[in-house]
Amino acid sequence: MVTAHIGKIPDDKMLRVCNEIGDLAFRFGGFFAIETGSEKAIVLKRFIENINSKGLAVNFDPANLISDVNENPVEGLLLLKDYIVQTHIKDCTKVKSDSSSKYIEVAAENGEVDFDIFFKVLDKIGFQGYNMIERNDYFDELDGMSQSINFAKKYIPTQKE
């Protein structure tokens, strides 16, 4: 699986490129997963449906939907459910800056993503993909990752040795 932010869509050139990459990924038994956040979920869904490649999928990042396009992640999950092959367990919180509000990344469970509902919806839609902890900008990297890992264990069964 290859995941990427592809920038704002629709873009005719990006449509052609994603079609080619999706088809190539499918031939090798994989996916090219577009990460959510550059656009509303409905725009991404239409883009993927327009391409119609079996190798094109979604890497669903709930924090990106909140921080980048001000969208409810649960609504995004339901719209994109047929295409999600991976999720990011990432959270964000709103902070005030000089003239506006912005979001910063925080350890999972310390922000605005309602993970109780998030994981219930993933279960309801039959999600069988990967859940990845993504870390971009924690203030304390080791503590933030440790918190996120411990938090994720509440929702994701771990393999016994």
Model-inferred region functions:
Residues 5-8, 131, 135-137:
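Short, histidine-centered active-site or binding-site loop motifs used for metal coordination
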Residues 5-8, 61, 102-105:
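A short, structure-level motif marking secondary-structure boundaries and short turns
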